[in-house]
Amino acid sequence: MSVGRRRGRILAFQALVAWDVGGAVLDDLLNFSWQNEDSIKDPNGYLFPKMMVLGTIENITEIDKVIQENLDNWVIDRLNSVDKAILRLSVYSLIYQKDTPPPIVIDEAINLAKDFGTDDSYKFVNAVLDSIKNKS
């Protein structure tokens, strides 16, 4: 059994936050051993979130450039780790994963921001991603 796409995005987001704050080893993140999901015994069950994490990290320079170009009066290095991880994951989806329509990517990002971010994170994430979508 594999994780669904929504759960996969949550796992990928959590892995990116852990990677960004610097305390997590990438190999540990990618096998999702930190998860306690008895129903996922198949290592292939994590292919979607693993692909999202690897794709985001492999393209981080371009992704961060796109984010920076769409920040008004902000510098990406000053963003909190939660908002940064949501934006990075979403920009990866917008640029490199053409199988998910942009409105769905943005909606998923807003949901992550509402669940894990500050009170205003979802507005900020929505504005940045909307700007990126409109320029592409």
UniProtKB/Swiss-Prot annotation:
Keywords for this protein: RNA-binding, Transcription, Transcription antitermination, Transcription regulation
Query: Per the record, what is one GO cellular component?
Result: cytosol
CDD domains tied to this protein:
Terminator_NusB
Q: Name one GO molecular function term.
A: RNA binding
One Pfam family, short name: NusB
- Top-level taxon: Bacteria
- Cite a single GO BP annotation: transcription antitermination
Q: Does the keyword Transcription regulation apply?
A: yes
Alphabetical list of InterPro entries matching this protein: NusB-like_sf, NusB_fam, NusB_RsmB_TIM44
According to its UniProt entry, what is the function of this protein?
Involved in transcription antitermination. Required for transcription of ribosomal RNA (rRNA) genes. Binds specifically to the boxA antiterminator sequence of the ribosomal RNA (rrn) operons.
The family database entries (PANTHER family) matched by this protein are listed as:
ANTITERMINATION NUSB DOMAIN-CONTAINING PROTEIN, N UTILIZATION SUBSTANCE PROTEIN B-RELATED
Tell me its family: Belongs to the NusB family.
Name by which UniProt lists this protein:
Transcription antitermination protein NusB
Q: Which organism is it from?
A: Treponema denticola (strain ATCC 35405 / DSM 14222 / CIP 103919 / JCM 8153 / KCTC 15104)
The primary gene name is nusB
